[in-house]
Amino acid sequence: MKKTLMLLAMVVALVILPFFINHGGEYGGSDGEAESQIQAIEPQYKPWFQPLYEPASGEIESLLFTLQGSLGAAVIFYILGYCKGKQRRDDRA
């Protein structure tokens, strides 16, 4: 029980601490930062690829990004659970 509470406190600290460390800071995406750095280094650079789908707003883009991450996590944890269940079944046999 003590170990669980300690781990939970560490997770909460990791979630909340960045907001206090970077108080008033801007949380921007890495795509925009990369684009500005490329333009600073090579102003004539033209992207060689365009997105297949451009979301209508930033909120929809965030939603799609979150769904993509959730789906990836679901697949990973399904595979881990399947392997664990298979291992338990083999141990019983």
Curated annotation (Swiss-Prot):
Ranges that cross the membrane: 5-25, 63-83
Annotated S-S bridges: none
Location in or out of the cell: Cell inner membrane
GO biological process, one term: cobalamin biosynthetic process
MF (Gene Ontology): cobalt ion transmembrane transporter activity
Entry keyword annotation includes Ion transport: yes
Name of the protein in question: Cobalt transport protein CbiN
Protein's organism: Salmonella gallinarum (strain 287/91 / NCTC 13346)
A cellular component term, taken from the record's GO annotations: plasma membrane
Subunit: Forms an energy-coupling factor (ECF) transporter complex composed of an ATP-binding protein (A component, CbiO), a transmembrane protein (T component, CbiQ) and 2 possible substrate-capture proteins (S components, CbiM and CbiN) of unknown stoichimetry.
Domain of life: Bacteria
